[in-house]
């Protein structure tokens, strides 16, 4: 089982799919990474050689922030917006949608379960 960026990649999946198990690497970045290292996207994870694994590891570490570093960066960005008091920071603080979605109806994921108000009948 190959281990990249602190993540165990699934054994029987194609490399193109297996790389997306790493936080910060989606389908497009996985394809770009395989092209840079010269590894076939159709190759299965358990067929990787040690040289290929080290090549992937080197490119990932040199090029992008992934996993813990990326998660810390995102959290720090959110914390900074909250501290400076910008609109997005206020929305984060109040637990409401940040990117301009409507909240009169919907937005239940951010707002949590519906709170019923007593005495609101016809």
Swiss-Prot record:
Locate the region Disordered: 95-122
Report the InterPro entries cross-referenced here: Rbsml_uS13_C (IPR027437), Ribosomal_uS13 (IPR001892), Ribosomal_uS13-like_H2TH (IPR010979), Ribosomal_uS13_bac-type (IPR019980), Ribosomal_uS13_CS (IPR018269)
Give any Gene Ontology cellular component: small ribosomal subunit
Keyword tRNA-binding found? yes
Alphabetical GO biological process terms: translation
Gene Ontology terms, MF aspect: rRNA binding; structural constituent of ribosome; tRNA binding
Q: What keywords are assigned to this protein?
A: Ribonucleoprotein, Ribosomal protein, RNA-binding, rRNA-binding, tRNA-binding
Task of the protein:
Located at the top of the head of the 30S subunit, it contacts several helices of the 16S rRNA. In the 70S ribosome it contacts the 23S rRNA (bridge B1a) and protein L5 of the 50S subunit (bridge B1b), connecting the 2 subunits; these bridges are implicated in subunit movement. Contacts the tRNAs in the A and P-sites.
Q: Which family, according to UniProt?
A: Belongs to the universal ribosomal protein uS13 family.
**Subunit structure of this chain's protein:** Part of the 30S ribosomal subunit. Forms a loose heterodimer with protein S19. Forms two bridges to the 50S subunit in the 70S ribosome.
NCBIfam families, A to Z? uS13_bact (TIGR03631)
> Which protein, by its recorded name, is this?
Small ribosomal subunit protein uS13
* Annotated source species: Corynebacterium diphtheriae (strain ATCC 700971 / NCTC 13129 / Biotype gravis)
UniProt lineage: Bacteria, Bacillati, Actinomycetota, Actinomycetes, Mycobacteriales
């Amino acid at each position: 089982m190959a281990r990249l960026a602190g993540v165990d990649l699934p054994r029987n999946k194609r490399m193109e799919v297996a790389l997306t198990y790493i936080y910060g690497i989606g389908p497009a970045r996985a394809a770009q990474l395989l092209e840079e290292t010269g590894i076939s996207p159709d190759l299965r994870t358990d067929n990787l050689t040690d040289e290929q694994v080290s090549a992937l590891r080197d490119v990932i570490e040199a090029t992008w922030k992934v996993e813990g570093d990326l998660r810390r960066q995102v959290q720090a960005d959110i914390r900074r917006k909250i501290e400076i008091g910008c609109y997005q920071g206020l929305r984060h603080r109040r637990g409401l949608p940040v990117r301009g979605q409507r909240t009169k109806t919907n937005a239940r994921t951010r707002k949590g379960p519906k709170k019923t108000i007593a005495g609101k009948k016809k």
